[in-house]
Amino acid sequence: MDWNHYRFRSPWHLPVPPAAVFAVLERPEDYPHWWPQVRSVTWLDDATGILTIRSALPYAMTFTAHERRRDPAAGILEIAMSGDIEGWARWTVTAAGSGTLAVYEQEVDVRKPLLRRLAVPGRAVFRANHRLMMRAGRRGLLRRLRAV
């Protein structure tokens, strides 16, 4: 087992139409306004930006995100990630009943040296930290969608 490799999947059921959810998720520069753990987003060009995230644990991770796919018809937003974490992340936004199912998937390898050193003893804590970040993101997205 590679202790520095992670796969995450977070389904969010949201009581709003898919187009409204997609419109918010496709604007990562606004994430810091509604997702507390996304600390900053700095665009480098139309498809590439640098993000810094930090959840409950006392460390931040910075990575470059490069857009690989933006398909409103399919409800897919996908990025390649490099830096403190390397891999990919994808939102898939679909209709579900009278609302939306937004599924966040991520497969990454941790490259940040401190986290690599703590990979074995810290793995469960790192996964819990990710769950906290995703829970806060869902709450923030709901607030943002209600305000729009």
What is the meaning of each model-derived region?
Residues M1-D46:
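Hydrophobic ligand-binding cavity/cleft-lining segments
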Residues W3, L57-P58, L115:
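Short, aromatic- and cysteine-enriched interfacial helices/patches
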Residues P11-P15, T42, H66, T92, ...:
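Generic structural detector for well-ordered beta-strands
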Residues V16-P18, D71-P72, A96-S98:
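Short loop segments at secondary-structure junctions
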Residues P17-A23, N129, M133, G137:
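Short amphipathic alpha-helical segments
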Residues V24, V125, R144:
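Residues that form generic nucleotide/phosphate-binding pockets
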Residues P32-P36, T42-W88, L101, R135-V148:
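Glycine-rich portal/gate segments that line the openings of hydrophobic small-molecule binding cavities
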Residues M81-R135:
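Beta-strand/loop substructures that line and gate deep hydrophobic ligand-binding cavities in soluble
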